[in-house]
């Protein structure tokens, strides 16, 4: 069993401090003055630390049970323990796909074999740690970082779409930006196009997301598919934040978000007539959807959503493989964010 204490770390952001002060009565700032509680007694919204990494996990839009489960899972992975890591996976069904490289495993034994090959070569100080979790014990969006040396010379900052059944992972699909990892390094590791998995096996786990998350996801996807920036803007809360990670763009407020989505309707890979929802996970307050695109620079990705009590989007984070886009497209996406 991994013993993990709760404390305030230097990795805490201003946003996280404000959330900690607003939720749960005792803010993050005061947490370090209190005796360290047991993991089972700590609310996810109050923040959790991760062993060996100075970061506070944002679990404000996740249930406590899934935050604890993900933390235990990645802590065991960080110990480079193949057998311990595999205890978090279902025997059947199980799917693990890297959506950028095309690496895929469709049964427990092959995944165990792969971990047994990877993990002995990991640096002793290597970590795989979560930074933000959205969802519940049926499914969640997990923002996590694999430090340099685990799968290459650079770190990987990914969004894992994870389905659970009886506290075991039945499906995990990882999305990340190949530009952050390095375009040439990503290309070296990617499987040939004709070997890339076409079936991401969402049918093996079904659609278990909360109805609110499904409704918002489908409405947003429809607005984006139709290039309807104004319709998409109606789904956002007054102080909402839109962020596209590969494009390095952040937009605040429904009016500005709507204008940006209208102006980039022909540029964003998750916008336009060829796009569709692949799979949805999460609770009524946190989760999101995987998308596919028939045309454009990137053919797959994920949109993570944080919702308020009224079902409005307070934060949208888009993740896709920027190494599939040329420089001019990313420059155009940045230019469209300039308001006049």
PLM regions with names:
Residues 18, 27, 32, 46-50:
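N-terminal leader/capping segments at the start of a protein or of a new domain
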Residues 68, 79-139, 229-284:
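A solvent-exposed, acidic/Ser-Thr-rich amphipathic alpha-helical stretch
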Residues 22, 41-83, 87, 182-230, ...:
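Short, low-complexity N-terminal intrinsically disordered segments enriched in polar/charged residues
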Residues 1-12, 24-31, 38-40:
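N-terminal secretory signal peptides
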Residues 11, 60-64, 105, 210, ...:
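Short, solvent-exposed loop/helix junctions and linker helices
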Residues 14-21:
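N-terminal export leaders
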Residues 45-57, 116-211, 265-273, 278-340:
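A beta-strand edge to alpha-helix "cap/lid" segment located at domain peripheries
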């Amino acid at each position: 069993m991994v013993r993990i204490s709760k404390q305030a770390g230097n990795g805490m952001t201003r946003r996280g401090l404000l959330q900690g002060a607003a939720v749960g009565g005792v803010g993050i700032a005061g947490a370090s003055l209190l005796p360290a509680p047991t993991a089972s007694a700590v609310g996810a919204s109050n923040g959790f630390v991760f062993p060996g990494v100075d970061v506070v996990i944002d679990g404000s839009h996740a249930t406590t049970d899934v935050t604890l489960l993900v933390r235990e899972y990645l802590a065991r992975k960080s110990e480079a323990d193949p057998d311990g890591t595999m205890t978090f996976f279902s025997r059947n069904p199980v799917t693990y796909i890297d959506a950028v490289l095309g690496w895929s495993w469709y049964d427990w034994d092959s995944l165990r074999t792969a971990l047994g090959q990877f993990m002995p070569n990991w640096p002793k100080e290597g970590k795989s740690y979560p930074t933000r979790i959205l969802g519940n014990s049926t499914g969640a969006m997990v923002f996590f970082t694999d430090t340099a040396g685990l799968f290459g010379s650079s770190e990987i900052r990914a969004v894992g779409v994870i389905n659970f059944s009886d506290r075991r992972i039945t499906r995990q699909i990882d999305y990340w930006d190949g530009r952050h990892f390095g375009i040439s390094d990503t290309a070296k590791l990617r499987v040939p196009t004709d070997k890339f998995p076409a079936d991401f096996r969402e049918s093996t786990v079904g659609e278990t997301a909360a109805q609110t998350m499904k409704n918002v996801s489908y409405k947003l996807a429809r607005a984006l598919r139709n290039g309807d920036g104004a319709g998409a803007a109606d789904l956002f809360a007054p102080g909402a934040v839109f962020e596209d990670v590969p494009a390095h763009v952040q937009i605040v407020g429904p009016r500005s978000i709507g204008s940006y989505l209208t102006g980039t309707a022909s540029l964003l890979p998750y916008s336009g007539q060829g796009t569709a929802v692949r799979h949805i996970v999460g609770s009524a307050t946190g989760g999101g959807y995987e998308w596919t695109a028939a045309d454009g620079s990137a053919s797959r990705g994920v949109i993570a959503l944080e919702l308020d009590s009224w079902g409005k989007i307070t934060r949208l984070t888009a993740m896709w493989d920027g190494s599939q886009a040329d420089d001019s497209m990313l420059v155009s996406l940045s230019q469209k964010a300039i308001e006049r």
